[in-house]
Amino acid sequence: MTEQKRPVLTLKRKTEGETLVRSRKTIINVTTPPKWKVKKQKLAEKAAREAELAAKKAQARQALSIYLNLPTLDDAVNTLKPWWPGLFDGDTPRLLACGIRDVLLEDVAQRNIPLSHKKLRRALKAITRSESYLCAMKAGACRYDTEGYVTEHISQEEEAYAAERLDKIRRQNRIKAELQAVLDEK
């Protein structure tokens, strides 16, 4: 046995033919961040979007608050028509005589009509600021009193004023619609 060398097992064995090659550090690029980080970013983005939307809505609400909240034309007509049918041609309001509000207020006091000054004033504003009323204001058109009689005719200046008011009201309605759309979005 001495002739044959028996290999001895050791823990530190050198391998023949291999030399140690020092390798560099390998850099691993992670393309996706961890799930907790993604979730945190999504929550932060959602909170930022909600805060921005809330700020937009608050700004739109404040901008919308400057406009007068008048009743609709149908509500205004239904408020005044039972007491003064001469002011209307069917369900469409006729052009009102100048100073009609004072006449209507006196009539309310004399006949004890259950209509407050505020409701009367708002109904008249809703009627006189409606697009159909302003479109009807053409030179030569007649103005009517509470009984339905012609009192005067529309002048050129009144027609020009009505056209200006109509443009302003249409512009305001367009702005109001945009602001309302901002408030209605989720």
Swiss-Prot record:
The lineage of its organism: Bacteria, Pseudomonadati, Pseudomonadota, Gammaproteobacteria, Enterobacterales. Belongs to the FinO family. One of its GO terms (molecular function) is RNA binding. InterPro entries: Fertility_inhibition_FinO_N, ProQ/FinO, ProQ/FinO_sf. The keyword Transmembrane does not apply. The keyword Repressor applies. This is Fertility inhibition protein. Gene3D superfamilies: ProQ/FinO domain. It comes from the Bacteria. One of the components on the FinOP fertility inhibition complex, which inhibits the expression of traJ gene, which in turn regulates the expression of some 20 transfer genes. The transfer genes are responsible for the process, called conjugal transfer, in which DNA is transmitted from one bacterial host to another. RNA-binding that interacts with the traJ mRNA and its antisense RNA, finP, stabilizing finP against endonucleolytic degradation and facilitating sense-antisense RNA recognition. Keywords: Conjugation, Plasmid, Repressor, RNA-binding, Transcription, Transcription regulation.
